[in-house]
Every structure is written in C-alpha cells, then in structure tokens.
Amino acid sequence: MAIKSDQISSLIKQQLEKYDSTLKIDEVGTVTYVGDGVARASGLANVMSGELVEFENGVYGMAQNLEESEVGIIVLGDFDGISQGDTVKRTGKVMEVPVGDEMIGRVVNALGQPIDGNGAIKTKHTRPVEFKAPGVMQRKSVFEPLQTGIKVIDALVPIGRGQRELIIGDRKTGKTSLAIDTILNQKDQDMIVVYVAIGQKDSTVRTQVETLREMGALDYTIVVSAAPSEPAPMLYLAPYVGAALGEYFMYNGKHVLIVYDDLSKQATAYRELSLILRRPPGREAYPGDVFYLHSRLLERAAKLSDELGGGSMTALPIIETQAGDVSAYIPTNVISITDGQIFLDADQFYSGNRPAIDAGTSVSRVGGDAQIKAMKKVSGTLRLDLASYHELEAFAQFGSDLDAPTQAKLARGRRTVEVLNQPLHQPMPVEHQVIVLYALTHGYLDDIDVSDIQRFQKELIDFVSGDKSYKKIFAAIKKTGNLPDEKDINSAIDDFKKHFSKSVEPTDYVAPSTKQEANK
C-alpha cells in the first residue's frame, strides 16, 4: 500500500498544531558545604527566606540565611546523601504538612510523616508550617474553661480555652505527667489534642503513647515526635508542625489543646543551627531572634472571634529550668510571652506533694474569667490559706507553744495540702472537685486525720454519686456551673460523715469551742 506524500505532510502539520511549547526555567545552585543538618549553596540569587529547595537526591531543604554570595539551608531529612558540588534547585513553595481528621490517633515525625507503623496517611488538605498569628480583631477574650482535672490547677491556676499557660520546673518534677493528665481529662470535652514531643527519648514517647491508648485518649490526640537522635532541624521544626496541625481544627471552629514538651530543647536545637549557620551569638550563645522563635509560635494559640468560627487553640508550653532558676534567658522569655505559669517545685516534689505545684509563684493572668462560679466560690480563700499555712509552718518549727487559732490554721493547712495531692493519671471531674473543696473550706475535714483524707474524698464522691437524692448535686454543677442550694450539699456531707469510719482519731484537731475561747 503506497502512502502519498501529501498525507504525510498533513499528519505532520496536525501534530505541529497540537504541540504546545512552554519554556521552563529552573534556578539551580551548587552545594558548597554540607554537615550537621545544614548545607550552604551558591547560585540561588533569587531564593526567598523560608522557601523550599530540592537537592539532587530528592531531599528537601529550607532556605534560612540569605547572604551576598551564598544561601544557608537547613536540610529536612537525611543529609548523608548530599555531597559538595551537588546541584540544588528552587521550588517556589513554602513548607507544608498534611492536616485533617485522618491525622487523629497517629504518631508522626516533624515532617508530618507517620512513624507508628500503621500505614500511610491520606489527607485532603495541607497547611503551611509557618503561619501568621491571628490579629487583635480576629480574637475574642478567653471565657470558656479548659478543665485539667487537676484540683490545684482548676482551683488556683485556672486555664481558659485559647490561653497560653507555661509549665515550668526542674527535670523530674512531673511536668510531662501534668500535661498527660490534662490530655486524659479532655475525654468527652469536645477537644482535639496535639502532643509535640521535642527531643524526648523514643522509649519515653512510646510510654506516653501507650498510656494515651490505654486510657482511650489517643482517639482524639495527634502525637508529633522529634527524637534527640534526629538532626537539629527536626527538633526546631516540630513545634511549628504541631501548631499547623492544630490550626486546621481551630480555623474550622473546633477546640484544640496543644502541648509543647519541651521548648527548652527546641531553643537548644535552634542555637545549634544558628551557630553552624554562623549567625552572631548573643546571651548564653543564643542568636538574637530566639525570642521571636517562641513568640511567633505561641501567638498562634488564640480564641478566635465568632466571625472566624469561634474555635480555639490552648497552648501548654513546657520549659525545663536548672536548679529552679526561672531568671535564665529562655524561661524569662517564655514567661513574658505566655498568660501565666505553673511552677513545679523540686522540694515539694521530693517531700511527697504531687503534683508539686508552688501555689505562691504560679499564676493565671486570664484564666480567672473562664473559671466556673462554683469553683470560684469554694476556692476563693484557698491561695491565702495555703500561703499563711506555709508561713506558720516555718514559724512553728521554732516552738511548740502555739495558741488554738494557730494550731487550727496549721491543721487546716495540712488537710489542704493533702486534698490537693492527686495520684498520677487520675484526673477528677470539676463537679467532684467542687464538692471535695467545699467540704475542706467549710471545716468538714477538720476532724478527719490527714491519713484518711484521700479515702474520705473518694468515698464522699461515691456516696453522692450513688445516692438518689444527692446525685442531682453533681448534675446541677455540671449543667449550670454554679453551686446548688448549700443546704443540700451540707446535708449530703453530714449524712456521709455518719457512715464514714475513721481509721484513726486526729491528734491535731482543735474543737470549734476551743478556737472561739482563744479568740476571746
């Protein structure tokens, strides 16, 4: 079969008409140095700060230092496959991570990739890792309580949804345990939790994940982990990745709790990166913008206005101190950024008070507006009572000849400290806390020995919960947030005390008549 030349030319013309010529220009540079999670490259004259660049082996990096002839790049992954002389090209994009409901219940690394062995995560959305915090007019005042389930916090240092509350203390004083207990208490609270482990040992993170799984808390929690064995860029980025994961839910009208455990290690990783990038060191060898490192992260936690959906993101950053020194550089920076701090005292921890919260130095600047009325009523004098107890306790060591009112204050103080002690991983609903603190502040525990206090409060809660005529007290507090008729509460506690069996009679009990006579 013969093919005519005009047919061939016609086919060629048709193909040429379909051909679309597009010119693609890539700006390519050359790697001049690589090591310790950092690379330097020349030839990327137009690269932007924070822009993603791609190395020859497919690993990505983020442009950080924009210098006259070179660009300092932090490598997002394994830098062993990158060599001097390799090509590196611009992408024109910023770093983004996958976000969405599919991330809940998973453990991911600082790039949002799963590391829990449960397969790939397929999400429909991504968010930039760096994102501008909401402005003044995009926010709303904090007014909704975030119940931690920890009596001493909910009573003395209340936290509201959208607040930034710092947890600060020496190593091994219970900072992480406090955060984990708060996460456990968010069950049935319509809350999504992001737990960011920065520089925590893999074995420690595994233990925390198993605790969350056993308690049913992993069903509403995302865990972001950057292990100490990973390069410094991973530890630096992990908190921002966690914030991006939380922001997705916040901007969709949901409530989020995010825990950064801990930001001291992020600051150390950032110092390491900055020194390798040859940025001028400042105080304690940190770079000049270390304050901005944390401020731009923590400002992303907010209570959004109704126009933006009314969602919130509450941040609990953790900072580790050395020998209780809160005046060091990083602690003072973060204290000035946050809306209050919970200070954990090593002396209290080793004396057996758990959680070891120092009520005198711990403060919540905005949480009081979010505290429920019932808790305000029963905890109003608690801080002063504790302060006067600690003062009297120090004074009482010098002599035993004390008058009756002083003895009564010391006895009440011992019971207050014992009531505020709480076992690990046993958060208490706020309505139960209110009844226990009511019994304490109204003198119902004065004739109960300190050794019986924990059993007394547990049995009191069981009694009120199980009694048909009294369980409405808990329901009323939960529904209205206010104290019901005090006659009902007094009646319930009086009835319970008739059935409560003391294991021992208190030796420090001061009868009311003795107190009154001494006052005369």
From Swiss-Prot:
It is a peripheral membrane protein. F-type ATPases have 2 components, CF(1) - the catalytic core - and CF(0) - the membrane proton channel. CF(1) has five subunits: alpha(3), beta(3), gamma(1), delta(1), epsilon(1). CF(0) has three main subunits: a(1), b(2) and c(9-12). The alpha and beta chains form an alternating ring which encloses part of the gamma chain. CF(1) is attached to CF(0) by a central stalk formed by the gamma and epsilon chains, while a peripheral stalk is formed by the delta and b chains. This is ATP synthase subunit alpha. Produces ATP from ADP in the presence of a proton gradient across the membrane. The alpha chain is a regulatory subunit. Keywords: ATP synthesis, ATP-binding, Cell membrane, CF(1), Hydrogen ion transport, Ion transport, Membrane, Nucleotide-binding, Translocase, Transport. It comes from the Bacteria. It comes from Oenococcus oeni (strain ATCC BAA-331 / PSU-1). Its EC number is 7.1.2.2. The record marks 362 as: Required for activity. CDD domains: ATP-synt_F1_alpha_C, ATP-synt_F1_alpha_N, F1-ATPase_alpha_CD. It catalyses: ATP + H2O + 4 H(+)(in) = ADP + phosphate + 5 H(+)(out). One of its GO terms (molecular function) is ADP binding. It is found in: Cell membrane. It holds the Pfam family ATP-synt_ab_C. Belongs to the ATPase alpha/beta chains family. One of its GO terms (cellular component) is proton-transporting ATP synthase complex.
